[in-house]
């Protein structure tokens, strides 16, 4: 029962994994295809809007040129916010110069940015930089004279006394001292009791050889079987035996077929075939389009 549950769980996980992989693949392909298409569409929309905006600016500048020309003809001295011509981008057409009466002000660009302001206060000091690279070695000093001897000032090192070493081991025992002087003779004491017996003395020297003994009885010879010796080496092989009786007749049916043999070498390549008939003519191509051409610059409403 547990085995069946495990198999069912594995199948469900297999379907879930397949579904997840499919969704991931579709999402990846969608992102690969949709993002460039969306970017291309947004760029196309931006280009179209830019052309429309430039056209509107051009028409507006033309209207203001007519207005200034009318003021010049009528002799009207006026200055309004739009008296200063703005710089147009994308169109090189020059307009009529403004002929106002009291024009003493300076010109400015279309973005409305004035002259640069005063310099700001100095900023805080930056973090210290990294150490520079080591300099090149200096030039070699002049050689000393041959007869000059080194002095104590030539050596600039100081050798302080070293620390005390560890304590050494005990020395060997000294020789025994001289014998002491004889003690005083005891007075008033009698002889003491006898001491215990001393240890046995060392063995004495060996004695001399004794006289030869009488001859013994004559010996008797007894025969007993000895132990068997090791086996000898193997003898030479004997002559071949007589021929055996003929065997019984075999079955009349042939035996089973043997296994298939190895594949033979590849044959020589065949002769080249005859050339085929010419194919059918292809369908005519589609007419050329104007998708690559920019949209015409027309007035709004067309």
From Swiss-Prot:
Q: Membrane spanning segments where? A: none
Q: Where is this region: Triple-helical region?
A: 114-143, 162-185, 189-221, 226-252, 255-290
Which stretches of sequence are listed as region Disordered?
Answer: 79-103, 119-302
State the protein's purpose: Nematode cuticles are composed largely of collagen-like proteins. The cuticle functions both as an exoskeleton and as a barrier to protect the worm from its environment.
Known partners and oligomeric status: Collagen polypeptide chains are complexed within the cuticle by disulfide bonds and other types of covalent cross-links.
GO CC list: collagen trimer; extracellular region
Q: What keywords are assigned to this protein?
A: Collagen, Cuticle, Disulfide bond, Repeat
Biased-composition ranges, Pro residues, are: 194-203, 293-302
The biased composition feature labelled Low complexity covers 137-154, 205-234, 245-281
Q: What is this protein called?
A: Cuticle collagen 40
- What SMART domains does the record point to? Col_cuticle_N (SM01088)
Q: PANTHER family per the record?
A: COLLAGEN, CUTICLE COLLAGEN 40
Q: Does the keyword Transferase apply?
A: no
**InterPro entries, alphabetized:** Col_cuticle_N, Collagen
Gly residues: which segments have biased composition? 91-103
Family classification: Belongs to the cuticular collagen family.
Q: Which GO terms describe its biological process?
A: collagen and cuticulin-based cuticle development
What does the record give under GO molecular function?
A: structural constituent of cuticle
């Amino acid at each position: 029962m547990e085995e069946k549950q495990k198999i069912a769980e594995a199948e469900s996980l297999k379907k879930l994994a397949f579904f997840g992989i499919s969704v991931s693949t579709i999402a990846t392909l969608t992102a690969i295809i949709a993002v460039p298409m969306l970017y291309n569409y947004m760029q196309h929309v931006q280009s179209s809007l830019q052309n429309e905006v430039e056209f509107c600016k051009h028409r507006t500048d033309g209207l203001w040129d007519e207005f200034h020309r009318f003021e010049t003809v009528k002799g009207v001295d006026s200055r309004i916010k739009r008296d200063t011509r703005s710089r147009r981008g994308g169109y090189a057409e020059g307009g009529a110069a403004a002929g106002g009466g009291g024009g003493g002000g300076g010109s400015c660009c279309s973005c409305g940015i004035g002259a640069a302001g005063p310099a700001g206060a100095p900023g805080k000091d930056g973090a210290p930089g990294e150490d520079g690279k080591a300099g090149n070695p200096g030039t070699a000093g002049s050689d000393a004279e041959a007869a000059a001897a080194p002095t104590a000032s030539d050596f600039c090192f100081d050798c302080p006394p070293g620390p005390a070493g560890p304590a050494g081991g005990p020395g060997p025992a000294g020789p025994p001292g001289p014998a002491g002087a004889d003690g005083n003779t005891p007075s008033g004491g009698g002889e003491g009791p006898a001491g215990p017996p001393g240890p046995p003395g060392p063995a004495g020297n060996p004695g001399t050889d004794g006289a030869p003994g009488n001859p013994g009885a004559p010996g008797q010879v007894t025969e007993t079987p000895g132990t068997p010796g090791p086996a000898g080496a193997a003898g030479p092989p004997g002559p071949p035996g007589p021929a055996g009786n003929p065997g019984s007749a075999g079955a009349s049916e042939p035996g089973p077929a043997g296994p298939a043999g190895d594949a033979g070498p590849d044959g020589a390549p065949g002769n080249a075939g005859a050339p085929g008939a010419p194919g059918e003519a292809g369908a005519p191509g589609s007419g050329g389009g104007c998708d690559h051409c920019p949209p015409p610059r027309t007035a709004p409403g067309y």
